[in-house]
Amino acid sequence: MFATLAAPQPPLPLDLVAAIQDLKRELNAVILAHYYQDPAIQDVADYIGDSLGLSRQAASTNADVIVFAGVHFMAETAKILNPDKLVLLPDLAAGCSLADSCPADAFAAFKAQYPDHWVISYINCSAEIKALSDIICTSSNAVKIVQQLPPDQPLIFAPDRNLGRYVMAQTGRQMVLWEGSCIVHETFSERRILELKATYPNAQVIAHPECEEAVLRHANFIGSTTALLNYSQTEDCDTFIVVTEPGILHQMQRRNPQKTFIPAPPQDQTCNCNECPFMRLNTLEKLYLCMRDRKPQIELPEDLRLAALKPIQRMLEMS
């Protein structure tokens, strides 16, 4: 008996960027990339944005193939919005600690304890959690959406407790919070940010609302990645301490080459960066290979897709 040998794979092209552009034309593909992706991936993307912007692009694209340079729940959202399109994710292992912190069975049991509550879920969650939700939000529109909901309507906010607390502070609404968090944003160190402020006394601290309250209290500005990017561009300040995943610094520096952007460090003294290990699983090589091989593909059962679609559509309508 002889083992079946795998067919040899063709070598990688010397110019990956040119090869990706050729495949994009061949497939009629669009490359969507999150701000937290590696700069090399951002530079070949057709659109770079935050979760809200990427959702809008996914909903409106005329491309036949969506190549999502991000994490799994983002590619899932693109598939939910585009069931007839081929949606590719360079690395299926690119998950999300926040999405993983909210298992569907545990959340369903949690939701059952509050039968009169509406569920507003942060888009950083699985399709199963979206299907259990009444409306989806992003960090860009969470405050705006909660402000539009009936003031006497009880709410559950999931899965990010830090974003939920921020939304409660901004709106004055009490909400029942699921105790989830992002491993990147919860590990920023208040002490080390204060040390940076002492070193750069004229710098402004700009932070993502997924951070802990102890960190946010030192921020001059709090907002989504797009809001942070816009603020750094328009604010009359030369130096910013950026308290979110450092992939965003690539776009900040491109738009503001004369300004200085300092990535906030985590608590761990051995590292001065706080990169998302899941976002960084995607590489230029994997991007090329997923387009060449038309896989990994994102697939969802139709009943789950339809259930998850409704709260996403509500979000887009209210945004």
From Swiss-Prot:
Keywords noted in UniProt? 4Fe-4S, Cytoplasm, Iron, Iron-sulfur, Metal-binding, Pyridine nucleotide biosynthesis, Transferase
Q: Which residues of this UniProt protein bind iminosuccinate? A: H34, S51, Y122, I123, N124, S139, H208, P209, E210, T225
Where does the UniProt entry say this protein principally localizes? cytoplasm
- Full protein name: Quinolinate synthase
Textual note on the cofactor: Binds 1 [4Fe-4S] cluster per subunit.
**Which cofactor(s) does the record list?**
[4Fe-4S] cluster
Q: Which reaction does it catalyse?
A: iminosuccinate + dihydroxyacetone phosphate = quinolinate + phosphate + 2 H2O + H(+)
Top enzyme category: transferase
- Return one Gene Ontology term, BP aspect: 'de novo' NAD biosynthetic process from L-aspartate
- Mind telling me which InterPro entries this protein's record contains? NadA, NadA_sf, Quinolinate_synth_type2
GO molecular function terms listed in the Swiss-Prot or TrEMBL record: 4 iron, 4 sulfur cluster binding; metal ion binding; quinolinate synthetase A activity
Give the family per the record. Belongs to the quinolinate synthase family. Type 2 subfamily.
Extract the PANTHER family matched here: QUINOLINATE SYNTHASE, CHLOROPLASTIC, QUINOLINATE SYNTHETASE A
What does the UniProt record say this protein does? Catalyzes the condensation of iminoaspartate with dihydroxyacetone phosphate to form quinolinate.
Cellular component terms (Gene Ontology): cytosol
Cell compartment(s), UniProt: Cytoplasm
What EC designation does it have? 2.5.1.72
Give the organism the record lists: Thermosynechococcus vestitus (strain NIES-2133 / IAM M-273 / BP-1)
Q: Where does [4Fe-4S] cluster bind?
A: C96, C182, C276
| This protein's record includes keyword Transferase | yes
